[in-house]
């Protein structure tokens, strides 16, 4: 019996609804943070934001359509 687990890629979101920044963080910050959120791997995209691979669908990622960054809560 096989089981299919949905996974997604995307930018991690901070509590403010913005992409999780990585500019002034150690080089392994994104990979470690993605791993903590059950993602397979991640990296700091253009030294600006953490991008993760193979995360569970339950993890919220930044999406242009639902962007609330800088718009209050």
Curated annotation (Swiss-Prot):
Disulfide bonds join 18-69, 22-44, 30-50, 34-52. The keyword Disulfide bond applies. The modification Lysine amide is found at residue 71. The keyword Secreted applies. It comes from Tityus discrepans. GO terms for molecular function: sodium channel inhibitor activity; toxin activity. Keywords: Amidation, Disulfide bond, Ion channel impairing toxin, Neurotoxin, Secreted, Signal, Toxin, Voltage-gated sodium channel impairing toxin. Residues 1-7 form the signal peptide. Pfam families: Toxin_3. Belongs to the long (4 C-C) scorpion toxin superfamily. Sodium channel inhibitor family. Beta subfamily. It is found in: Secreted. Negative results: does not affect the cardiac Nav1.5/SCN5A, the peripheral nerve channel Nav1.7/SCN9A, and the voltage-dependent potassium channel Kv1.5/KCNA5. SUPFAM superfamilies: Scorpion toxin-like. Has the structural arrangement of an alpha-helix connected to antiparallel beta-sheets by disulfide bonds (CS-alpha/beta). Beta toxins bind voltage-independently at site-4 of sodium channels (Nav) and shift the voltage of activation toward more negative potentials thereby affecting sodium channel activation and promoting spontaneous and repetitive firing. This is Toxin Td3. Residues 8-70 form the LCN-type CS-alpha/beta domain. It comes from the Eukaryota.
